[in-house]
Regions:
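Acidic, surface-exposed loops and disordered segments
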Residues: 2-359
């Protein structure tokens, strides 16, 4: 199929440049359209900014002509923390949706087939593409949000215009297998208690503690959580819901905020099927990016939902019989605060294998 790019312009995203506008294409052929491999790699580099447990980045991509395949990397599943492997799937779902967003900003609709190979459970998705009629400002805003999003463990101020923002976040959850709920303020203390209990249960879990120490080490790396992304003891004390990481000697930040005033959201699933959990990761991406577009800060939490007792408590707090998969703090960071440096990511050539390419 002939694809004519007219009035091509590029939108710089940090180290990336994606084609973002002005293509026309014939309606015939559709899935036979082949995307330039360079565009795919640029989009994958942007997509790999997705969050994952301890920034473990448990994904691997294969580009074969115009088809892109996502695989779970079993060597990057943190088994002591993530007993079921669900958090690795959530991270892979998030990177899959980030990729969809990046390709949309480049002018392509991503068609996703989840678990295409019943004989290979590591093969999570295959993606092919058709040209988009028109790239909107909304498509570009979501792609820009990928680079602006951070996992912010500091206390938040109250979210502005929450009523309208919460509606947008609910609309972002498009999977029938996943739901988004908010923990009522009056039940917040019970969630904080569940968070404390979850941490207490892990105090003497040597495998868990070893894993945590490894992924928050002092060494320079392209993975894990750098100390610049962690908080001091006093900062941690002002956020009652969260994982206990090794504390840092950072100067007290956001003293004007006081105690955390974030809204607490829960993404849960109607079953625990691997496909559903993968979709939940995609919905996590959608909620995080929509919140970022709205100018809000976010922090994903799984310390409570990693253990069945914690999941049961969270389900009762939202009044559902679903399985809570991830908690999201959403709130306001001070407007004049400088955006912290991004957490590191592995080089794209370590993550992406190109078997055949198109130009």
């Amino acid at each position: 199929m002939n694809v004519a790019f007219q009035g091509i312009k590029t939108q710089p995203w940090g180290p990336l440049t994606l084609v973002t506008a002005g293509l026309r294409a014939d309606a015939e052929g559709m899935r036979d359209t082949v995307v330039d491999t360079r565009i795919i790699k640029q989009a994958l580099k942007l997509a790999c900014r997705a969050p994952s447990l301890h920034n473990s980045q448990p994904w691997r991509w294969v580009v074969d002509g115009g088809t892109v395949m996502l695989y779970l990397d079993p060597d990057r599943v943190l088994h002591a923390t993530d007993h079921t492997g669900a958090e690795a799937l959530l991270g892979c779902g998030a990177v899959l949706d980030h990729f969809r967003v990046a390709m949309a900003a480049a002018g392509w609709v991503a068609h996703i087939e989840r678990y295409p190979n019943p004989n290979n459970r590591m093969h999570l998705a295959s993606v092919d593409f058709t040209p988009m009629d028109y790239v909107t400002d909304g498509h570009r805003a979501l792609a820009d949000a990928i680079l602006r999003r951070r996992t912010d463990r500091l206390p938040f101020g109250p979210a502005r215009d929450w009523e309208s923002v919460s509606v947008a976040l609910e609309r972002a959850v498009t999977s029938d297998a996943v739901r988004l709920d908010e923990v009522p303020d009056e039940l917040r203390s019970e969630l904080a208690q569940a968070s404390d209990i979850a941490e207490t249960l892990r105090v003497y879990d040597s495998a868990y503690q070893s894993e945590l120490d490894w992924w928050t080490g002092l060494f320079e790396s392209s993975e894990g959580i750098p100390h610049s992304s962690l908080v001091s003891a006093s900062e941690s004390d002002r956020v009652e819901i969260g994982r206990h990481f090794p504390v840092t000697p950072n100067t007290e930040r956001r003293p004007q905020v006081g105690r955390d005033q974030a809204r607490i959201l829960v993404l849960s699933t109607y079953d625990t099927d691997r496909t559903t959990v993968l979709e939940c990761g995609e919905m996590l991406s959608a909620v995080l990016l929509e919140a970022t577009v709205a100018g809000l800060a976010t922090c994903t939490l799984t310390n409570i939902t990693e253990l069945w007792p914690g999941r049961d408590v969270v389900a009762s707090l939202i009044g559902q019989t679903t399985t809570p998969q991830v908690i999201i703090r959403v709130g306001q960071a001070p407007g004049l605060e400088q955006l912290p440096p991004p957490t590191p990511r592995r080089p794209i050539d370590e993550v992406v294998e190109v078997r055949s390419q198109q130009q």
